[in-house]
Structures are given as C-alpha cells and as structure tokens.
C-alpha cells in the first residue's frame, strides 16, 4: 500500500503546486473533506476556502477559489478557478480587496451586485485566513 499521494493544484493559468503529501484537507461544497493515501476515487465541487496538506511532518496551506477536486489512484487533482500557496499571498492586496468588498456591500443595494461583492469578500477573507495560518 502506498504511504503518500500526489497533490496537484492547477488553475487555468498555471500549476500552483505538484508535491507528494501524506494528507489533503479541502473545502468541499458540502463541507470539508480529507484524503489519505489509498482513498477510494471520487469527484467533489470545491467552495472558496483553505486547503491544507501534510508532508514530512509539516502542515502547509493554500487558498482555493472554487473548482473541483478529483481523487483517483493516489492522486488528488485540484482544478481551481484561482489558487495560491499561503506564502505567495500578498496580505496587503488581500486586505484592500476585503475593504473594497465591504464598501460595496455597504453601498446602496440596488447599485451593486451583492452576490459578486459577497463572493469577493469571502475570497479576500479566505486568502487572509490561509496566509495567517501559514
């Protein structure tokens, strides 16, 4: 039996991460799920949030913004709309995005797309959470 699995995080622009890991925890659409080596195959929609993985006794974090996770043959493939490793997150940029989203939500509701503003706020908060966890 395998003792590790391959984790790949891919966006439309690039491969964010490709690494052998011991465990993956991801923000599924219906709630967080975890994957250990030799897990049964499955496919899950992802929500905006924190993905974490363990390798060599260390826990590392990444931000994912929606997409899908595929688990098959000791490989976890994350196909995300956007993703960043914790160490690559620009805290100042995330804080500014949070501030812009909060200001849009406070504006008159008729003049904004509240759903888009809420999603932007959720992305900014998740990025900050991931960066602070690292």
From Swiss-Prot:
| Topology in membrane | Peripheral membrane protein
Task: Indicate the transmembrane segments per the record.
Answer: none
- What does the UniProt keyword field contain? ATP synthesis, Cell inner membrane, Cell membrane, CF(1), Hydrogen ion transport, Ion transport, Membrane, Transport
- GO cellular component terms, A-Z: plasma membrane; proton-transporting ATP synthase complex
Q: Which Gene Ontology molecular-function terms are recorded?
A: ATP binding; proton-transporting ATP synthase activity, rotational mechanism
Domain of life from the UniProt record:
Bacteria
SUPFAM superfamilies membership: Epsilon subunit of F1F0-ATP synthase C-terminal domain, Epsilon subunit of F1F0-ATP synthase N-terminal domain
Gene3D superfamilies reported in the protein's UniProt record: ATP synthase delta/epsilon subunit, C-terminal domain, F0F1 ATP synthase delta/epsilon subunit, N-terminal
Q: Where in the cell is it found?
A: Cell inner membrane
> What is the role of the protein in this entry?
Produces ATP from ADP in the presence of a proton gradient across the membrane.
Cite the record's note on assembly: F-type ATPases have 2 components, CF(1) - the catalytic core - and CF(0) - the membrane proton channel. CF(1) has five subunits: alpha(3), beta(3), gamma(1), delta(1), epsilon(1). CF(0) has three main subunits: a, b and c.
Protein family according to the UniProt entry: Belongs to the ATPase epsilon chain family.
Protein name as catalogued: ATP synthase epsilon chain
